Design a protein with these regions (language model features):
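Catalytic active-site module of serine/aspartate enzymes centered on a nucleophile-bearing elbow/loop
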Residues: 185, 193-220
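Conserved alpha/beta-hydrolase "acid-adjacent" motif
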Residues: 160-166
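Primarily recognizes the serine-hydrolase "nucleophile elbow" in alpha/beta-hydrolase
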Residues: 82-146
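The conserved beta1-alpha1 loop
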Residues: 29-33, 127, 155
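Acidic beta-to-alpha connecting loop that harbors the catalytic carboxylate
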Residues: 34, 157-159, 184-186
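Catalytic histidine neighborhood in serine/cysteine hydrolases
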Residues: 173-191
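Serine-hydrolase catalytic machinery in alpha/beta-hydrolase-like enzymes
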Residues: 5-97, 189-196
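Short beta-strand/loop motif that positions the catalytic acidic residue
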Residues: 147-148, 153-155, 159
Length: 220
């Protein structure tokens, strides 16, 4: 189901897409990455795959993307929008166990506003940007070391924003985090023709990990 949602707290209208299977295990609220909105094939495919596996999803456009802009102009704005969406979800879907997160930037935003995501069971990242592209020395988000909410990092092994050595070191230092490598996948888990698995297979593999993670924490 696609619908427009007016965010009272920010005074803007955004597009959302909600997929709810019969008797879902939980609901995963996730935001898109910086460069592409909820109509991107990656977001749509993840939603449809999770639907088939029994997990409800709620995804949404940030306002800048809704207005056709390429990139966000302010961290504060996207943070406030994520919090406003969560407030709406808590009101309308309070019968579900709720998980949050997102693709790349969307996942990072969820970590910045974690203190405002009440009733959250866990964070799920679809390719978390651990460092600047090709710059493992430029770690972004040291604050995530303070998060105690369970976290699942789903990272492509060929992601230029998530080199293996630094990613494994950082995740190992977190309070309650799991790391799963999608072998051969780049930032959106796309692969080369030589890779044993294609992007669709890696998305399916990642969604299996999401289901397993949610089963561990949806009652917590």
């Amino acid at each position: 189901m696609e619908k427009k949602l007016f965010l009272v707290d920010v005074g803007e209208e955004i597009s959302t897409r909600i997929l709810i299977p019969e008797n879902p295990l939980c609901m995963y609220v996730f935001a898109h990455g910086a460069g592409a909105g909820i109509d991107h094939d990656f977001i749509i495919t993840v939603q449809k795959t999770l639907f088939k596996k029994g997990i409800a999803t709620f995804t949404f456009n940030f306002v800048y993307k809704e207005k056709g802009k390429k990139l966000p102009t302010s961290k504060k704005l996207v943070d406030e929008e994520y919090k406003a969406v969560w407030k709406y979800v808590l009101k309308e879907f309070n019968n579900y166990s709720l998980f949050a997160g997102g693709k790349s930037m969307g996942g990072r935003v969820s970590t910045r506003v974690i203190d405002d995501l009440s009733e959250i069971k866990g964070l799920i990242f679809l390719g978390f940007p651990i460092h600047s592209p090709g710059r493992p020395d430029k770690f972004v988000g040291a604050y995530i070391k303070n998060i105690r909410t369970p976290m699942l990092f789903l990272q492509g092994s060929k992601d230029p924003l998530s080199y293996k050595e630094i990613t494994e070191k950082i995740v190992a230092e977190l309070h309650n985090a799991q790391l799963y490598w999608l072998e051969g996948g780049k930032h959106s888990w796309e692969t080369t023709k030589k890779n044993p698995k294609n992007q669709m297979q890696l998305i399916n593999e990642a969604c299996d990990q999401i289901v397993a993670f949610c089963k561990c924490y949806y009652k917590g």
